[in-house]
From Swiss-Prot:
Residue numbers binding Mn(2+) 2: 126, 310, 364
Protein name, as recorded: Protein phosphatase 2C 51
Gene (name only): PP2C51
Domain PPM-type phosphatase: 77-373
Subunit structure: Interacts with ABI5 and PYL5. Binding to PYL5 is dependent on the presence of abscisic acid (ABA).
Cellular compartment(s): Nucleus
Length: 381
């Protein structure tokens, strides 16, 4: 369902909803009152009206949470939201591809031991200098990754090396994606007046990618977008932000001949506030496109996964973000305020997190993906 309306500031506000749990109107029901009732809102009455897009989807699996690993679905449900916030342009992009390995067409993408052929792909891309690179990643990254994984399987690599295979595939995928973006910059046609389109050289994007399978979760991060797993009520970060003042990143930038300058925050060459990204042709080799990859085995304590751009994480801690998502997914908000809050879907959780970020003063675009890994017990009550 697609709707277009007007926000409180007169800007166009586009809402896109994809149903799965019957929560198609989730984004429209989000208001400051909901956040205040959860005791987590700040005083910003316009916060909830800046939603640009919402997506929600789910599987039909409603089985008990007390299951063995082999019967876990890769993903019970998911929801996402992208909010333009106080920026003039939306530069973020979100990608969600259920059972994305099927995109290889011949089944070769299914990895032995890596989820028994069912892997879901989720990603948040935080663009800067424009949306060109983030959009390119949204369209291509999952395709490139499926190709890289399939290639490794066809080479006959051992199933026992699953973690290494995933890391290699992620590294190769990010390198290919960066190569495609940089190549498009180099091949860009000159303007009508004959000058070079130098603006393309200053466009880039962070990327946090999660592949969720039945047995493991693989996260690759390049930049300061972040992935956080809620495991047994504890917020477990699955990525580490690439900030220019991070000691190892500072050392890497300087070793490449660059400098980190404190200019309204630490920035590479005084320009970019992240030390790794895809694109940013003009800052290479100081800014790297190589991701850090983490592979974690799933447990029966895993509840949900949050991926988000720094528009959320700059103002909301990992712990608070997980608390809000948990309140939505376990149905607590709906049971307390059934007349105004549905509060039991991943889309509700993503929308509330984005609203909280705006109400707390985030000045960036905000994109959030919430992936429900199992039904929380109180939800069925």
């Amino acid at each position: 369902m697609r709707e277009t309306g007007a926000t409180d500031e007169g800007h166009a506000c586009e809402v896109v909803v994809a149903g799965g749990d019957g929560k198609a109107a989730a984004a429209r029901r989000r208001r400051r009152l909901e956040l205040r009732r959860l005791g987590l809102a700040a005083e910003d009455d316009a916060a909830a009206k800046r939603i640009r897009s919402v997506k929600d989807g789910s599987s039909s699996d409603d089985s008990s949470t007390e299951v063995v690993p082999r019967s876990w679905p890769a993903c019970v449900s998911h929801g996402s939201v992208s909010v333009i916030g106080r920026r003039r342009e939306m530069e973020d992009a979100v990608a969600i591809e259920r059972t994305f390995m099927a995109s290889t067409g011949d089944g070769a993408g299914a990895i032995r031991g890596g989820g028994e052929g069912e892997e879901d792909f989720f990603a948040v891309y935080d663009g800067h200098g424009g949306s060109r690179v983030a959009e390119a990643c949204r369209k291509r990254m999952h395709v490139v990754l499926a190709e890289e994984v399939s290639l490794r399987r066809l080479r006959g690599q051992s199933a026992s090396g699953g973690d290494v295979r995933w890391k290699e595939a992620m590294l190769a995928s990010f390198a290919r994606m960066d190569g495609e973006v940089v190549g498009s910059v180099a091949a860009a046609a000159p303007r009508v007046d004959g000058t070079e389109p130098s603006g393309f050289r200053t466009v880039g994007s962070t990327a946090v990618v999660a592949v969720v399978g039945r047995r493991r979760i693989v996260v690759a991060n390049c930049g300061d977008s972040r992935a956080v797993l809620s495991r047994g009520g504890v917020a477990l970060p699955l990525s580490t932000d690439h900030k220019p003042d991070r000691p190892d990143e500072l050392e890497r930038v300087e070793a490449a001949g660059g400098r980190v300058i404190n200019w309204n925050g630490y920035r590479v060459l005084g320009v970019l506030a992240t030390s790794r990204s895809i694109g940013d042709y003009y800052l290479k080799p100081f800014v790297s496109a190589e991701p850090e990859v983490r592979v974690v085995e799933r447990t029966d304590k895993d509840e949900f996964l949050i991926l988000a751009s720094d528009g959320l994480w700059d103002v909301v801690s990992n712990e608070v973000a997980c608390k809000i998502a948990r309140n939505c997914l376990n149905g607590r908000a709906a049971s307390m305020f059934p007349e105004s809050v549905s509060g039991s879907s991943a889309a509700d959780a993503a929308a509330l997190l984005a609203e909280l970020a705006v109400s707390r003063g985030s000045r960036d675009n905000i994109s959030v993906v919430v992936v429900e890994l199992r039904r929380l017990k109180s939800r069925a009550a």
